[in-house]
C-alpha cells in the first residue's frame, strides 16, 4: 500500500513539473512570436521610409501598440 501511494505521489509531482515546463515554453513562444512581429514591422517601416516617408504611419501606430509605448518617434531609433 505504501508503494502505491508513493507511485501516485511521484506521478502527481511529475504532472505538476510538466505543466510548469509547458507553461514556460508557451510564454517564451509568445514572446518570440511578438518579437518577430515587431521586427517585421520595423523592417517594413524602414523600407517605406526609404521609398516615400509618409506611408508608414499605420505601421508606426501598430508598432507602438505592440511595444506598449504611446507615440513612437522613429527619428530617435538608431538601428533603422
From Swiss-Prot:
Keywords assigned by UniProt, alphabetized: AIDS, Apoptosis, Host membrane, Host-virus interaction, Inhibition of host innate immune response by virus, Inhibition of host tetherin by virus, Ion channel, Ion transport, Membrane, Phosphoprotein, Transmembrane, Transmembrane helix, Transport, Viral immunoevasion
Activity control: Ion channel activity is inhibited by hexamethylene amiloride in vitro.
Name this protein carries in UniProt: Protein Vpu
Any GO MF annotation of the entry: CD4 receptor binding
Membrane topology category: Single-pass type I membrane protein
GO cellular component, one term: host cell membrane
TM spans (from-to): 7-27
Additional observations: HIV-1 lineages are divided in three main groups, M (for Major), O (for Outlier), and N (for New, or Non-M, Non-O). The vast majority of strains found worldwide belong to the group M. Group O seems to be endemic to and largely confined to Cameroon and neighboring countries in West Central Africa, where these viruses represent a small minority of HIV-1 strains. The group N is represented by a limited number of isolates from Cameroonian persons. The group M is further subdivided in 9 clades or subtypes (A to D, F to H, J and K).
Gene designation per UniProt: vpu
One BP term from GO: symbiont-mediated suppression of host type I interferon-mediated signaling pathway
InterPro entries: Vpu, Vpu_cyt_dom_sf
Post-translational modification: Phosphorylated by host CK2. This phosphorylation is necessary for interaction with human BTRC and degradation of CD4.
Species annotation: Human immunodeficiency virus type 1 group M subtype H (isolate 90CF056)
Amino acid at each position: 500500500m505504501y508503494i502505491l501511494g508513493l507511485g501516485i505521489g511521484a506521478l502527481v509531482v511529475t504532472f505538476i513539473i510538466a505543466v510548469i515546463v509547458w507553461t514556460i515554453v508557451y510564454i517564451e513562444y509568445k514572446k518570440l512570436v511578438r518579437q518577430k512581429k515587431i521586427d517585421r514591422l520595423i523592417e517594413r517601416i524602414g523600407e517605406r521610409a526609404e521609398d516615400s516617408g509618409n506611408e508608414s504611419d499605420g505601421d508606426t501606430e501598430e508598432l507602438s501598440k505592440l511595444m506598449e509605448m504611446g507615440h513612437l518617434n522613429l527619428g530617435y531609433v538608431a538601428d533603422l
